[in-house]
């Protein structure tokens, strides 16, 4: 783990030097683990459910705290889901959920660690996907195998590319919630001024040509972005590589593929075509966008609604597209799963599972996607009449879902 952390520090430094871009999450792999049901696990789930039913019959209410991250539409979605649950299933089963804002993913993770030591954790929390393994291996998360199997939750209904980070050593520790991929955002009004349209930027050569044209013809930046491993990994994946090797004990940035990726961005930065920021300055990218001083930036599909609001306010046309193709298309996934903490009572665990099921069911997956811009996590959600109608009205929202077909293994864990 120490060696891996050192590698990740090196990668972050390289990412900052290259101006390689950013995102809102991290890894994905193309494998789905199977869950083995044990008698002990089933008995555990039965006992917890019986406890919850007895408490409901006696009029007791189980109070749960649920921690979430981010403000804006994401915050509204979390608050609305908790309220809707409390008014329906919660009222029926004697469960009340209080949703509490905890800042960024990193801030939430730090608070969870401190709360676990003090035995004051919430019952549930969102968790950035690349962090799940670390928390699970340290015994902080509840193994969900028994809950999933006893409840008959169809894990196969979740999009396959979103599942790997839910598993640790073939056991389930989280359910896909607000999930994302990095995508390309464009101010198409600026691109048009330079003779380009976002729909024509399909390859790295196109990206370089469009960004150069913007800089030369308008004096604005072709691309603005802050550095982060997530998008750097997407660029490496598109070159048939990754930022770490398969065993995560060596960086691949010093390979021909790594040098090509870093060299591409370094040249554009040196020419003043790309406005690069370090990984702590992501707000400055938003400032460039709001000042109409950049044509292209890369970010999470979860930022779609915020970017649409900016475009509407400032009167420019927003475009979204796949990460431009190098040797091939490719992307990691990001965002968060919902997890259950391991140090709560059986009564609280039974109640927490009810909320986890509710917030990741098809109807709520549809609502969350439309509300926030994150991916619809379930196939039944993405294929629903409601989502299909939404995609017809808002085709920009379908880009990330279509890009899921190109998800590749991202060999790294959260450096935090």
What are these regions (language model features)?
Residues 210-213, 249-278:
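Glycine-centered hinge/linker elements that transmit conformational signals in sensory
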Residues 64-80, 102-105, 180:
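Extracytoplasmic "Venus flytrap"
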Residues 60-72, 95-100, 123-124, 173, ...:
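Short, well-ordered beta-strand elements
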Residues 130-145, 149, 160-199, 225-248, ...:
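Periplasmic solute-binding protein
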Residues 90-158, 189, 193-195, 202, ...:
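Extracytoplasmic "Venus flytrap"/periplasmic binding protein-like
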């Amino acid at each position: 783990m120490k060696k891996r952390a050192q590698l990740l520090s090196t990668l972050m430094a390289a990412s900052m030097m290259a101006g390689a871009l950013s995102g809102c999450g991290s890894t994905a792999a193309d494998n789905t683990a199977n869950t083995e049901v044990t008698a002990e696990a089933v008995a555990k789930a039965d006992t917890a459910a019986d406890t919850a039913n007895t408490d409901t019959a006696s009029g007791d209410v189980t109070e749960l705290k649920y921690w979430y991250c981010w403000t804006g539409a994401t915050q509204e979605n979390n608050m609305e889901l908790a309220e809707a649950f409390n008014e329906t299933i919660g009222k029926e089963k004697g469960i009340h959920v209080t949703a509490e804002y905890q800042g960024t993913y990193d801030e939430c993770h730090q608070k969870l660690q401190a709360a676990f030591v003090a035995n004051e954790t919430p019952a549930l929390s969102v968790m950035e996907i690349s962090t799940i393994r670390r928390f699970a291996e340290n015994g902080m998360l509840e193994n969900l195998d028994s809950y999933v199997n006893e409840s008959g939750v169809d894990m196969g209904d979740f999009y396959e590319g979103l599942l790997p980070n839910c598993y640790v050593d073939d056991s389930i520790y989280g359910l896909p919630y607000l999930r994302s991929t990095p995508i390309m955002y464009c101010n198409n009004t600026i691109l048009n001024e330079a003779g380009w349209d976002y729909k024509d930027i399909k390859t790295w050569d196109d990206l370089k040509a469009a960004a150069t044209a913007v800089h030369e013809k308008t004096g604005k930046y072709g691309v603005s972005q802050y550095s982060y491993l997530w998008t750097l990994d997407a660029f490496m994946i598109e070159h048939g590589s990754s930022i770490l090797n398969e065993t995560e004990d060596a960086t691949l940035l010093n390979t021909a593929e790594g040098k090509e990726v870093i060299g591409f961005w370094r040249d554009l930065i040196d020419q003043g075509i790309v406005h690069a920021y370090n990984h702590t300055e992501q707000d400055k990218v938003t400032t460039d966008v709001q000042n109409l001083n950049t044509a292209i930036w890369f970010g999470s599909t979860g930022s779609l609604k915020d970017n649409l609001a900016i475009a509407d306010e400032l009167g420019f046309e927003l475009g979204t597209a796949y990460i431009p193709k190098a040797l091939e298309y490719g992307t990691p996934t990001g965002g968060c799963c919902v997890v259950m903490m391991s140090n709560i009572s059986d009564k609280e665990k039974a109640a927490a599972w009810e909320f986890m099921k509710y917030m990741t069911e098809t109807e709520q997956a549809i609502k969350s996607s439309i509300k926030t811009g994150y991916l619809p996590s379930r196939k039944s959600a993405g294929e629903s009449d409601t989502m299909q109608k939404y995609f017809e009205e808002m085709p920009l929202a379908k880009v990330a879902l279509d890009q899921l077909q190109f998800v590749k293994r991202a060999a790294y864990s959260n450096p935090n």
